[in-house]
Regions:
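Terminal alpha-helical anchor/extension segments at protein ends
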Residues: 1-141
């Protein structure tokens, strides 16, 4: 990640909308509706699997660790993080990201101020930020 992006995020509260394939990061208390950065999961090379099965099963999780590692590196400079995910249970990438943090980045895990679920694929950046602010307020910040 570029240093200028990390400097924008450093010691600020941020929102991260995390899906299976990418995460967008905004400053929580900023008027801009444009994400500060995006982290994209590398497409795994799937062998012995039909194209229709790409996102089903274990092969789709191959590139998840490097994706979560890069996202954690970006968020590690923030003071507080609100995570917004899409879906429930194992399909919610936020839950899997938090599990990753529990094992690999406990200090960052402690700065997760709030989490939530929303239909982020159908929401604009502004709507995601507003939802994150609601979650932030509910968490007494």
């Amino acid at each position: 990640m570029k240093n200028d992006v990390l400097e924008k995020i450093r010691d600020r509260s941020v929102v991260a909308a995390v899906t299976h394939d990418h995460a967008r990061v905004w400053l929580l208390n900023d008027e801009s509706r444009d994400p500060v950065c995006e982290v994209t999961r590398a497409t795994p090379i799937v062998r012995h699997v039909r194209a229709a099965q790409d996102h089903h099963g274990h092969a789709s999780e191959v590139a998840e660790v490097p994706y979560f590692t890069e996202l954690a590196a970006v968020l590690s400079v923030a003071s507080n993080v609100v995570l917004v995910g899409h879906g429930v249970g194992k399909s919610n990438a936020v839950n899997r990201f938090i599990n990753h943090l529990d094992v690999h980045r406990e200090a960052l895990r402690n700065r997760i101020a709030a989490t939530g679920t929303a239909n982020i694929t159908a929401m604009s950046g502004g709507q995601i930020i507003e939802e994150a602010r609601r979650k932030w307020a509910q968490a007494d910040h």
